[in-house]
C-alpha cells in the first residue's frame, strides 16, 4: 500500500498538470477560429506593466511576513526580512513542499527569532493570505451584474451578492483570535511543534488581512493588464472581476495540495470563472490562464534569484543544516530501534532459559 502511494503521488503531481494543460490546449485550438473574430494583439508595453505588477506583489509577501513577525514580538530589518522570505522560496521548487518552510524557520532563527514564533508567523501569514483571497473574491461578486450565465446558475444576481456578503461575515468570524489560535495550534500539533499563545489582537489580524487584500489587488490589476494586453477592448468593469478571479484561483490552486503551486488547478479555475463572469472565448481564457502563470512565475524567479544570490551561501548552509538534522533524527530512530530489538532478544532468551531450567 505504501509503495503504491509512493508511486501514485509523483504520477499525479506530474501527470495531472499535463492532462489539464492538454485539455486547455485542446480548447484553445478548437476555439481558435472564434478567437480570430476578436481584436487580438500583443501589447509589449502592457505586458511589461503586468510583469512589474507581479514583481511588486512578490515584494509585498516579505513585507507582510515582516509585519506579522513584528506583531508577534520579533522585529527584523527590512532588507533582511525580504532576503529571508524570497531566498527561502527558492527551495520551494525542490520536491517535498516543506523545504521553504524549514529553511525560513532555520534562517530566521539566526536572527534571534524562536522556532515556535517563526512557525506561528508562517501559519498566520498563510491563513490570512487565503482569507484575503476569499474576501477579495467575495467583494468582486458585487460587480457580477449583467451576467446571464451566473443568473441561470444561481437564479439571480441577488443570490450572488448575498453569497458574497455571507462569505465576508464568515471570514470576520473565523479571523477572530480565539478561533484563529485554535486553527494555528491544531496545525502546529500536526507538525509536531509546540503550541504557541497567539498574542495578536483582532485588529492586528484584520490589518494583516487588509494588507493581503492590497497585495491581491496589485496582482489582480496585473492580471487585468495582462488581459488588456491581448484584448484591448476589455471593459473597465472587468477590473474588479479579474482581481477576484485571480485571488480565488490562487487559493484553489494552493489548497489542491496535489501539484506544485497548484499547477493546472489554478489555470482550470481561471478558465471556469472567466466562463461565468466575462464573455470571453474559451481560447482567450486559456491563453490568459497559461500566460499569467508564466509571467508571475518569471517575476517570482527573478525576485527569488536576486534574494538567493544576495544572501550568499547562507541559504545553502541552512539547507545543509536542516538535512543534517534530518539525518541525525533518522540515526537516533535507528539506534532506538536497535536497542529495542536487542532488549526484546534478551528478554526472549531469558524466558527460553527459564523454560529450559524448569
Predicted feature locations:
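Interfacial segments of multi-pass membrane proteins
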Residues: 106-117, 267-284
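Membrane-embedded alpha-helical segments of transport systems
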Residues: 90-95, 109, 119-138, 252, ...
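Extended non-transmembrane interhelical loops and adjacent amphipathic helices
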Residues: 82-110
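Transmembrane-helix boundary and interhelical linker motifs in polytopic inner-membrane proteins
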Residues: 70-72, 79, 100, 106-116, ...
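Predominantly cytoplasmic-facing regulatory/coupling regions of multi-pass membrane proteins
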Residues: 1-86, 143-254, 277-358
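Transmembrane alpha-helix interface/packing and boundary motifs in multi-pass membrane proteins
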Residues: 87-94, 247-267
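Membrane-embedded alpha-helical core segments of multi-pass
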Residues: 61, 99, 132-143, 164
Amino acid at each position: 500500500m505504501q509503495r503504491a502511494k509512493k508511486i501514485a503521488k509523483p504520477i499525479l503531481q506530474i501527470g495531472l498538470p499535463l492532462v489539464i494543460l492538454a485539455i486547455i490546449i485542446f480548447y484553445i485550438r478548437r476555439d481558435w477560429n472564434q478567437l480570430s473574430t476578436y481584436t487580438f494583439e500583443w501589447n509589449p508595453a502592457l505586458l511589461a506593466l503586468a510583469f512589474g505588477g507581479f514583481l511588486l506583489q512578490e515584494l509585498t509577501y516579505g513585507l507582510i511576513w515582516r509585519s506579522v513577525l513584528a506583531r508577534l514580538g520579533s522585529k527584523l530589518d527590512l532588507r533582511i526580512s525580504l532576503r529571508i522570505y524570497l531566498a527561502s522560496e527558492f527551495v520551494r521548487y525542490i520536491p517535498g513542499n516543506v523545504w521553504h518552510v524549514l529553511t525560513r524557520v532555520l534562517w530566521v532563527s539566526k536572527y534571534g527569532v524562536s522556532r515556535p514564533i517563526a512557525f506561528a508567523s508562517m501559519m498566520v501569514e498563510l491563513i490570512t493570505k487565503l482569507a484575503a483571497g476569499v474576501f477579495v473574491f467575495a467583494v468582486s461578486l458585487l460587480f457580477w451584474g449583467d451576467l446571464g450565465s451566473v443568473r441561470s446558475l444561481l437564479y439571480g444576481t441577488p443570490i450572488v451578492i448575498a453569497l458574497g456578503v455571507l462569505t465576508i461575515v464568515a471570514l470576520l468570524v473565523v479571523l477572530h483570535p480565539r478561533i484563529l489560535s485554535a486553527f494555528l495550534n491544531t496545525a502546529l500539533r500536526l507538525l509536531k511543534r509546540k503550541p504557541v499563545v497567539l498574542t495578536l489582537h483582532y485588529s492586528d489580524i484584520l490589518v494583516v488581512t487588509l494588507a493581503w487584500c492590497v497585495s491581491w489587488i496589485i496582482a489582480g490589476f496585473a492580471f487585468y493588464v495582462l488581459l488588456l494586453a491581448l484584448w484591448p477592448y476589455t471593459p473597465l468593469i472587468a477590473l474588479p472581476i479579474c482581481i477576484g478571479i485571480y485571488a480565488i484561483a490562487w487559493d484553489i490552486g494552493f489548497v489542491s495540495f496535489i501539484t506544485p503551486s497548484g499547477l493546472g488547478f489554478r489555470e482550470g479555475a481561471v478558465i471556469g470563472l472567466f466562463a461565468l463572469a466575462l464573455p470571453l472565448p474559451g481560447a482567450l481564457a486559456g491563453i490568459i490562464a497559461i500566460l499569467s502563470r508564466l509571467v508571475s512565475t518569471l517575476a517570482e524567479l527573478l525576485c527569488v534569484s536576486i534574494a538567493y544570490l544576495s544572501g550568499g551561501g547562507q541559504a545553502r548552509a541552512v539547507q545543509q543544516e536542516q538535512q543534517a538534522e534530518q539525518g541525525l533524527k533518522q540515526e537516533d530512530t535507528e539506534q532506538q530501534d536497535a536497542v529495542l530489538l536487542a532488549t526484546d532478544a534478551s528478554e526472549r532468551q531469558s524466558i527460553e532459559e527459564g523454560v529450559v531450567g524448569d
